[in-house]
Amino acid sequence: NSESQWASVKRALRVFDGVIPTVFATGNHDYGVRNAEDRTTQFNDHFPLTHNPLTCDGQGGGIFLEGPATRDGKVTLENAAYVVKVPGGRNLLIVSLEWGPRRFAVEWAREIFARPRFRDHLGILLIHDYLLPSNQRDGQDGNRKRPGNPHWYKTGLAGDTHDGEDLWNALVRKTPNLRLVLNGHEMGAHVGYRQDDNDAGKAVHQ
């Protein structure tokens, strides 16, 4: 979470500006000094709402729909919803959530997915921590003290955070149109996959 690293990432991603829209899901190393010591971040300084006009041009254009206001009244891309219209196909509702999302973010996401206008959209959730290489959701075994689990970091010590199993129970399984969850956090070739039916009996690919 250093100025030089953020500047480097911004330069690298600038190639997409005005060419294709970009969507982010912030991770533990985007917060605090090095590794989620707190919720401070330089993400919003380098990637404001209007960083890419195809994501949000500030005048209603772009795929950005909305995000919940923070305590200081700002809307950022840390928690954001996007609508992607697919010609001849099923439109997408993409929601990206902050690292170890707090309750307000999860509740906001649940409300977005539940809106009648998005009933027939294909819902996609982007989140940094969710599935492990073992194909288990993080926290599914009840171990919230595992290094790497959001509850293990200082940002999660107060209890207002969600790991993969928390998200499954609080959001994913309860949302009929949420059919795909994508996450990062696991390094190298550590890729997991699982499919579970949600409470509506529909398959969710994770």
Spell out what each predicted region is.
Residues 2, 104-107, 116-178:
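Active-site-proximal segments of metal-dependent phosphoesterases and phosphodiesterases across multiple
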Residues 159-206:
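Conserved beta-sheet core of the metallophosphoesterase superfamily
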Residues 1, 27-28, 128, 184-185:
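Active-site glycine-centered loops adjacent to acidic/histidine catalytic or metal-binding residues
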Residues 30, 131, 188:
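Short active-site segment of divalent metal-dependent hydrolases/proteases
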Residues 2-108, 117-118, 191-206:
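Extended active-site neighborhood of metal-dependent phosphoesterases/phosphodiesterases
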